[in-house]
From Swiss-Prot:
Family matches, as Pfam families: Lipocalin
Keyword set, alphabetical order: Disulfide bond, Glycoprotein, Secreted, Signal, Transport
Signal peptide: 1-22
Identification of the protein by name: Epididymal-specific lipocalin-8
Disulfide bonds: 79-166
Segments forming a coiled coil: none
Gene of this entry: Lcn8
GO cellular component, one term: extracellular region
Length: 175
């Protein structure tokens, strides 16, 4: 019985690894550049899900091996932007940022959705967050959302339900 249990655990682990590998994309920076609205966040860490500042939207710009991420937040009714410069890592689709932060593009169709994995080293621990973004301000239920749900089935899921006025202003280039 113990051997069968060990075999099943190893089998599940192998399937998980294969599934994780299959989500790697050959990133084309020019195609993923531009506006993205945050729709959903998943993490097994409640601290991450209860963050005071929630990103409403991102604007990605690429130059050489670098990426500039301009994020917009709603802070007490005012839109606040924050920019961060990251550099490409050895693995395609992975970028390192100051402050022990990393972004990994897990999946994208470039036109409608992207799924990012954010990693933050804080107080000696790695925190992982999966985020689902769309290009559209209105339509959040894209085909990639179901993939996101599958990827995050064992984690906490937080759906963003607000209008996203700051994301709208970012898309229009007004912030």
């Amino acid at each position: 019985m113990e051997a069968r249990l060990l075999s099943n655990v190893c089998g599940f682990f192998l399937v998980f690894l294969l599934q994780a590998e299959s989500t790697r994309v050959e990133l084309v920076p020019e195609k993923i550049a531009g506006f993205w609205k945050e729709v959903a966040v998943a993490s097994d860490q409640k601290l991450v899900l209860k963050a005071q500042r929630r990103v409403e939207g991102l604007f990605l710009t690429f130059s050489g091996g670098n990426v500039t991420v301009k994020a917009v937040y709603n802070s007490s009714g005012s839109c606040v932007t924050e920019s961060s410069l990251g550099s490409e890592r050895d693995t395609v689709g992975e970028f390192a940022f100051p402050g022990n932060r990393e972004i990994h593009v897990l999946d994208t169709d470039y036109e409608r959705y992207t799924i990012l994995k954010l990693t933050l080293l804080w107080q000696g621990r790695n925190f992982h967050v999966l985020k689902y973004f769309t290009r559209s301000l209105e339509n959040e239920d894209e085909p990639g959302f179901w993939l996101f749900r599958e990827m995050t089935a064992d984690q906490g899921l937080y759906m963003l339900a607000r209008h996203g006025r700051c994301a709208e202003l970012l898309k229009e280039g007004l912030v």
